[in-house]
Structure formats: structure tokens, C-alpha cells
Amino acid sequence: YNIVLRYVHTAREGAARLGKLIEQYGSAEGFGIGFIDDKEIWYLENACGHKWLACRMPKDQYFVTGNQSRFRDYAPEDKENFMAAPDLIEFAEKNGLYDPNDAEAEKDKHGKAKFDFHKAYSRDEELDTTYNYPRVWGLQQMFSPAIQNDVTKNTFPVFAKAAHKISLTDLRTAFRFHYDHTDHDPYLHENGKEPYRPVSIFRTTQTHIIQVRKDLPHAIGHITYVAFGMGDLS
């Protein structure tokens, strides 16, 4: 709050200010943070150091992330939907994190290898196959059953369309998710060594759902639902 929210009025301004602070001061580790107002939602991913990328969330799709970078695409010319460190691509190219002449990569509209933010600035490790991928896979299966993905591979769509409008009840269910009634349900099977990390875990200190009802006055239109502790016990 002290370094961002008190200085901004919109979600876009919030993402832009935090990005400038990252450029100026740097950061020790990657993270993601969302900003919401009554018109837009922006989500910023930090790539450690002084690099960052922020995307405006599509209004007809949802976004799920674990403890890992999820963004892929970046179109510098699309100022309406993207903001980033000004040298995001150039730095990656200069330091061998991105090769615009990669013959095997998907091409952009200029005929160059498409820039992939996750590939350039993040990584996929063995731990992700049990700690991060399953949560993204599980919630996308919950909201979009038609999506067929291998839970062991990071090929999940960044944004996805839900099979139906997502309600507050759906979000509460999502925050309580622990691979319910499957072989990976650690609570059902009393398996303290279950490898898949659930969304709902005992070390959760707070669970938040933020709702913006733009047709109502600010005083009653913006609501935060908070559960103190793991979602499944709320």
C-alpha cells in the first residue's frame, strides 16, 4: 500500500507504478500481483532483477496461476493490453535468453521467432510438475472441462474461457480445491506425503475474493471476502 496504492487511481496506473519501481530498485525474486478497478484488471509478473511484464486481463476469460510465471506473449506495439520494462526483449536477446532467429520457434508477424516471456525470464523445474502445474490444471479442469492438457507439462493456456459464468460460489470452491475425491486428495486419503500441492493447504493464512460491482456506489460496490486460514475450513 505505502509504495503503490496511495499514489494511483486506476488498475493501469497501479501496474505502471509498480513496474517503474521494479525498474528503479529491482527485486530479489519473481512474483505476480493483480490490480483491479471498476473498468479493468491488470496483472503484473516480475522477472526478478529489473524486468517486468503486465497484461490487461481479457473480459471474457479467466487467469489461473500458481507460484510460477505464466505469461507468454508480449506485443510492444499493443499499448492497450501490455506494459513492460522498455528493454524487456532487447535485454533477453543481448543476454542469450531469446533468439529472434530461432528457426524452430513460432514466428511473429515480422517473421522473427516469437518472444516468449516465460521461456526467457522464468524456468520449468521438476518441482513444478507437482507444486505448480497440478493447481493450474485442476482449476482449468474445474472451469473449462473441455481443455485437455497433460498435468506434467506446462502447456496450459494462459487465459481460458469458462464453460459457464464463474460465480462467487465457484470461486469459493476453487479456493477449497484439494483434488477432491481423486487419488491425489491428501485429506481424503490421509496422505501427508501426497506430492500434488493443493490450492487449499493448512499453512494458508488468508484467502481473498474481491468483487467489484461497478453499477453500485464505491462505498458498497467494492467488496472483499476474507477467510482467515485455509479455504476448505472457511
What positions do the PLM features span?
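Well-ordered mid-protein domain cores that form the structural environment of catalytic cofactors
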Residues: 1-21
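Glycine-rich loops and low-complexity Gly/Arg-rich segments
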Residues: 2, 6, 58-61, 68-70, ...
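Generic alpha-helical structural element
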Residues: 3, 7, 55-56, 160-164, ...
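Short capping loops/turns at secondary-structure boundaries
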Residues: 7, 11, 24-28, 43-47
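C-terminus-biased signal that marks the final domain/tail of proteins
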Residues: 15, 19, 26, 30, ...
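Active-site-adjacent helix/loop patches that line small-molecule binding or acyl-intermediate pockets
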Residues: 33
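A cross-kingdom feature marking charged/low-complexity
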Residues: 36, 40-74
